[in-house]
Amino acid sequence: DPMLQDSQGFNALHLATHSSNAMLVLYLLMAGEMPVDTADTLGHTSLMWAAYQGDSLSVQILLKHGARVDTKDREGFTPLHWAVVKGNRECLSKILMAGADIKAGDKSGKTPVDMIKELKGTMIWDKALSDAKLSSDGQTRRTPFDKLMVLFPWYIALPLAVAQFLFGHIGAIKFLLRTRTPNDMLQTPYYTAVFQSTAFWVGFVWLRYLLGNTSHLLWMNIAFFVGYTSALYFFYGAVMADPGWTKANSSYESQREAVVQMADRGLLDARHFCVSCIAQRPLRSKHCKFCNRCVAKFDHHCPWIYNCIGAKNHRAFLIFLALFLSSVPIYAYLSFEYLHVLSPSYVPVSSDPCLLGDTLCGYFQYDAFTTTLAFWSLFQMTWPGLLFLVQLYQVGQAKTTNEAMNFQRHSYLGKSMTIRQRILRSLTEIDSEMAGAGHPLQEESINLLEANGTATNDEDEVTLFAQEESKPVGFGDHEGHNHGARRAGGGGMWNLLVGTARRRRQQGEDRDVNPFDFGLWQNCVGFWSDGTQGPMRGVNWYSFYEAEARGGAATSRRM
């Protein structure tokens, strides 16, 4: 009986929490249907223990199952008091978001705020309040939504223009949006508003000033119009699109069934199961903490489009970047041609000297707004240009940004060749119509497998990824938790061009770098055809799983 208690009042749920085994906590609550707020002999609930240990995943699970945040132990400590003792920001944030009272006192009247001051954890406390969107007194922080349009006069003096820009930027994020941390900014449409406002003024200036005064550049204007409108089309396509939300289990019964099934298969762990969505994680998916959803083939969360980039909108995002980068130089050329044709010779003003040279000073003197907007648009090419190059490189390597940045964390990357063989076998054996005996897809996949993964000589050593063993988080005398990863190697561009996921032998085991890499050409064909062509055509990333049972063999399947 998991509800039996020992001499200290600990039941199975307490012990699972002590060992920071979040998946066992989830299993006991859903399969065992244990009461969540049972206290031990000292009045400590499982939520208090999880908060004290800084186990944010267990805290999240317990809160989702109705754990109370207002319970007190024998000393009058609430779960928030214990979270303050540990000082873990995520635990503090989750408990505050659950409605914990920051003014609740213990037997001596000491509140969590008093304790945080004594422990000198004010900085973490402020960040946790910001995460929970609370003010310093624990009240919900209000953000004004009044629309305000202010037209500032444009001065020639560049320092004043820069100061104006900084004032507007800082004023918006500090007083209008009332953000405290960079993460707060990512949860607002501020960055995408910067782009959209720039796009609006670019279109307005082109229609109002440039089009009529540069009519001799007919094809340049046509090219700009096509590029501008197409870029906006794909931009809003990426913004408004479903990036690839995976299906979450909505009912309690379906959630319970999913937990039990994963536990029976030995796969109830954070790598294969999302405790936020209470659903199995498809291969290459990730739970976005900003959107609070799991995204199939997750690439990254992009604040510039206020959306995630995933299976459904990745192509639209890259097409937008390409069109944007090709349209901005055309717009700048039209702007400077307009200024060159119409601006008179610069007339120096003794009281207001200009140090930019006669040409630029003349442009600013004639039309400061258009000149500034042209330079601002060129400046805006920096981040999309770098991002576009990185994205193209990753497409050529068949990696997502998430995989490239967290390579050592993914079980299907850096694994042995058997992972690649299972993936190819799932693609060539499941669908009899597409992958029957002798079908070109099957032959192509097998040939690519042989070309990309059979070399084992030390001469082929290019990249090594090795992950050290992780020790589980313990309680009491148990050892702590730490990770380690090592990376060495080179020749990434050569790998990209020839498409070989070369390996090196470590401790007698061959290591494959990326099971999805079939070479530059095949990777690009698969990406730009939206998975309808190439060796991995027909893959449904919403139900494509690679799961490795504890002590068993990995399996892959396509549905």
Curated annotation (Swiss-Prot):
Q: Does the keyword Electron transport apply?
A: no
What domain comment accompanies this record?
The DHHC domain is required for palmitoyltransferase activity.
Which SMART domains does this UniProt record tie to the protein? ANK
What is this enzyme's EC?
2.3.1.225
One Pfam family, short name:
Ank_2
Q: What is this protein called?
A: Palmitoyltransferase AKR1
Q: How does it sit in the membrane?
A: Multi-pass membrane protein
Keywords from UniProt, A to Z, are: Acyltransferase, ANK repeat, Endosome, Golgi apparatus, Lipoprotein, Membrane, Palmitate, Repeat, Transferase, Transmembrane, Transmembrane helix
Species, as recorded: Mortierella alpina (Oleaginous fungus)
